[in-house]
Amino acid sequence: MKTSILILAAGLGTRIKSQKPKVLQELCQKSMILHILKKAFALSDDVSVVLSHQKERVEKEILEYFPKTQILEQDLQNYPGTAGALSGFEPKNERVLILCGDMPLVEQTSLEALLSNNAKLNLAVFKARDPKSYGRVVIKNDSVEKIVEFKDANTQEKEINTCNAGVYVIDSRLLKELLPLIDNNNAAKEYYLTDIVKLAKEKDVMIKAVFVDEDEFMGINDKFELSIAENFMQEKIKKYWMQQGVIFHLPQSTFIGADVEFVGECEVYENVRIEGKSKIINSIIKSSSVIENSIVENSDVGPLAHLRPNCELKNTHIGNFVECKNAKLNTVKAGHLSYLGDCEIDSGTNIGCGTITCNYDGVKKHKTIIGKNVFVGSDTQFIAPVKIEDEVIIAAGSTVSVNVEKGALFINRAEHKMIKDYYYKKFQK
């Protein structure tokens, strides 16, 4: 049975206390709404998102990554509440999966389990450790009797710890029939989607409660809950990669972005941060190193190294206090304390301590190209644009501002001067 998916993301999110809309808050470098959309499009090609607060800003991000998403706008003034969000929604398929925009931890497998039940109305519920302000779910004889919003619950109902996860699967025809019957006769004067359960019961519709994991279906309302959710997501990411064969030393100290990929046998030491769409292939990343949007293949990086965006390393050693940016290094050794930016360095080349590619002239960035089997002495500066051909020796302390031909020795030093007995003349008068 085909499914249409609707994601509710129109709320103000005032408790998040941010100028950025709640659904654009990031976990593991990806906004909440993008995490949910990735799972939604894995299940259906008919996905809609309901927006209102900062609609243009949220819509721009959604369509950048998921251009096939249908965007709807909720009239919060006239139709507030979760049921009001469905006004104007026209599903293309036989049933509808309704999700919340602040649930980035939900797994695709859990949604598939929810969809595997063929009841006309399925409701995701969980046993809450601390029910707090969740809506309470009353279940009798394996069927949901009603959902009571916390604001409207009596003392007895507040004792119930079976709570509404806010995720529904409903027959499209049933939704179309019941939605116009929902009213706003409640304390908040809102149109509650939860009322659809009461209306379905009045029509003797079987409502199936599907129990799910509380942590996975947690909604995020403030920055504290955001941090909890990110911790859960980090644990999932690292557990997955460890099951694929990656070794993490002290994994709790390491940050791995949601889009990072590991291939083959990799080893990651403590306090490492790997971001963006980085790809690590058969490599070792040592302590306290940072890698941003870079590819590392058959190499070792660190400790205390920094690969800024667009680096490509192959068969290369990057040591401590080396920073690279937009650098392509193939079979290179850069052991310590260097900046290699906007450069290409070929096989067999050794970069001495204190080497700098001076790539910026105050207006534009320029490139340094270094060939094969080049020996670069310590404390060398390359004034880009500059090209060093194969099998060159650059003497320590040189400033290279011209191209160097193959096989040459390049030396550029100020003439030394030594004044005899100067110390005694200055201090022992």
Curated annotation (Swiss-Prot):
Keywords linked to the UniProt accession: Acyltransferase, Cell shape, Cell wall biogenesis/degradation, Cytoplasm, Magnesium, Metal-binding, Multifunctional enzyme, Nucleotidyltransferase, Peptidoglycan synthesis, Repeat, Transferase
Residues that hold Mg(2+) according to the record: 102, 221
SUPFAM superfamilies, per the entry: Nucleotide-diphospho-sugar transferases, Trimeric LpxA-like enzymes
Gene Ontology BP term (one): UDP-N-acetylglucosamine biosynthetic process
Cofactor list: Mg(2+)
Cellular location(s): Cytoplasm
Chain positions covered by the region annotation Pyrophosphorylase: 1-223
Keyword Metal-binding on entry: yes
Assembly and oligomerization: Homotrimer.
Biological role: Catalyzes the last two sequential reactions in the de novo biosynthetic pathway for UDP-N-acetylglucosamine (UDP-GlcNAc). The C-terminal domain catalyzes the transfer of acetyl group from acetyl coenzyme A to glucosamine-1-phosphate (GlcN-1-P) to produce N-acetylglucosamine-1-phosphate (GlcNAc-1-P), which is converted into UDP-GlcNAc by the transfer of uridine 5-monophosphate (from uridine 5-triphosphate), a reaction catalyzed by the N-terminal domain.
Family (UniProt): In the N-terminal section; belongs to the N-acetylglucosamine-1-phosphate uridyltransferase family.
Protein name: Bifunctional protein GlmU
Biological classification of the source: Bacteria, Pseudomonadati, Campylobacterota, Epsilonproteobacteria, Campylobacterales
Gene name linked to the record: glmU
